[in-house]
Amino acid sequence: MMQTEQVRLVIAEGLPCEHLQVAGDGHHFEALIVSSEFVGKSRVQRQQRVNQVLRQHFDSGDLHALSMITRTPEEWRAARG
């Protein structure tokens, strides 16, 4: 089982993030990930990229479920007004 901070660190180490928030209960996590790496990618491609970063933790069973919102920096700025 992973802790929220561990999930955040793994994502941050594997993906350049302008903004990253992770919340969870040890089994299910939610993440808001803002990365310039998402520019030009579909929602599915973005999620696949995050899943790639976390693959070994999913495969080992340490991480069970992650729901995510993925945004480019421009999308994030626009959403915040």
Across the structure, where does each feature detected by a protein language model lie?
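Short edge beta-strands and adjacent turn/loop segments
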Residues: 14-30
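Charged, amphipathic alpha-helical segments and their flanking helix caps
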Residues: 43-53
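A short interface-forming secondary-structure element
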Residues: 32-45
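Histidine-centered active-site/metal-ligand motif
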Residues: 28, 47, 64
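Short, internal active-site loops enriched in acidic
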Residues: 27-28, 37, 72-76
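N-proximal, solvent-exposed amphipathic alpha-helical segments enriched in charged/polar residues
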Residues: 1-18
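C-terminal structural segments of small proteins and small subunits
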Residues: 51-81
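Solvent-exposed beta-strand sheet faces enriched in polar/charged residues
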Residues: 23, 32-34, 69
